[in-house]
């Protein structure tokens, strides 16, 4: 059982550290842009930096990663790592957006402006480190849920919104009337229909690639977990294991009693026991209370 807990703990640790590094690096990159008064190569510094897709995509990704952190910490505390579907979808959106940022920077902006220019300064974080780390983290450390076709369509929404806003501000409003200049150069150097017809199919392919990597990681992890838990619990007495698990957790001096239903469900799924989840939860709670070191709660009543 200790090994099962270690698997969950390692997954939580990797997800926590990768999410935290993405958040920190995005904060560094955006702060560098905000505090740069002028840049001879990029005119969108200071508050104008929020016009750029690079910055907005990284902020979205960092915000989504920040929402992952509380669930990883809770997983470390309770040994029951779980993320809601809506957070998985939000992270998927952010990762798809920064993946587009990375690929455009690498294959379009770098040949035009030079690799060193595109991947130095704040752009080292926003064009390179954050997108790559976010992709790796989501595909390999946060593959707790399988991505569906619906999830993939949702991942396209941020890029679609920015595409519409960019076109309106550049081509419809125009810089002379308070809009934006074509700082990416896609509309001034090419017929409008080319970038407009290419951006969403490209984003779709990126989202598809991320989904394939994520789901393969999910399938591998589930297969490994299934083999491990089947070997561990096939002939085991689940009732005794749940009781032992409760006794080991009861030594922790915490007031909230958290029953690890996910772990118990996995045990039941891979065992031949006739015990139900409800019965296991009752066994856990009873054993926990009988062995808990925090039974005197009178001083905590308000």
Q: Which residue ranges define each predicted feature?
A:
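Membrane-interface transmembrane-helix boundary segments in multi-pass integral membrane proteins
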Residues: 51, 171-213
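Interfacial segments of alpha-helical transmembrane regions
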Residues: 79-97, 148-156
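Short, highly charged, low-complexity non-transmembrane loops/tails of multi-pass membrane proteins
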Residues: 218-232
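Juxtamembrane "helix-exit" motif on the non-cytosolic side of transmembrane helices
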Residues: 31-40, 106-115
């Amino acid at each position: 059982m200790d090994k099962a807990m270690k698997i969950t703990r390692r997954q939580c640790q990797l997800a926590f550290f990768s999410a935290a590094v993405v958040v920190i690096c995005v904060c560094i990159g955006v702060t560098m842009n905000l505090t740069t008064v002028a840049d001879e190569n990029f005119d969108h510094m200071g508050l104008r930096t929020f016009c750029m897709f690079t910055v907005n995509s990284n902020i979205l990704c960092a915000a989504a990663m920040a929402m992952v952190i509380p669930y990883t910490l809770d997983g470390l505390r309770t040994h029951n790592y779980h993320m809601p579907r809506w957070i998985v979808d939000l992270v998927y959106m952010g990762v798809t957006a920064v993946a587009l940022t990375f690929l455009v920077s690498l294959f379009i902006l770098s040949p035009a402006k030079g690799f060193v220019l595109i991947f130095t300064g704040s752009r080292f974080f926003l064009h390179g480190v954050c997108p790559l780390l976010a992709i790796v983290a989501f595909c390999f450390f946060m593959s707790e849920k399988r991505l569906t076709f619906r999830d993939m369509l949702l991942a396209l929404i941020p890029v679609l919104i920015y595409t519409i806003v960019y076109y309106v501000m550049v081509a419809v409003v125009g810089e002379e009337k308070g809009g934006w200049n074509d700082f990416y150069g896609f509309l001034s150097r090419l017929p409008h229909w080319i970038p407009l017809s290419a951006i969403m199919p490209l984003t779709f392919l990126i989202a598809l690639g991320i989904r394939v990597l994520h789901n393969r990681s999910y399938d591998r992890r589930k297969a490994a977990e299934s083999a491990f838990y089947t070997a561990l619990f096939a002939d085991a007495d689940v009732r005794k294991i749940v009781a032992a698990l409760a006794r080991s957790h009861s030594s922790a001096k915490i007031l909230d009693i958290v029953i690890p239903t996910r772990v118990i469900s996995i045990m039941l799924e891979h065992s031949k026991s006739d015990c139900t989840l409800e019965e296991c939860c009752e066994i856990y709670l009873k054993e926990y209370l009988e062995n808990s070191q925090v039974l005197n709660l009178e001083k905590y009543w308000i």
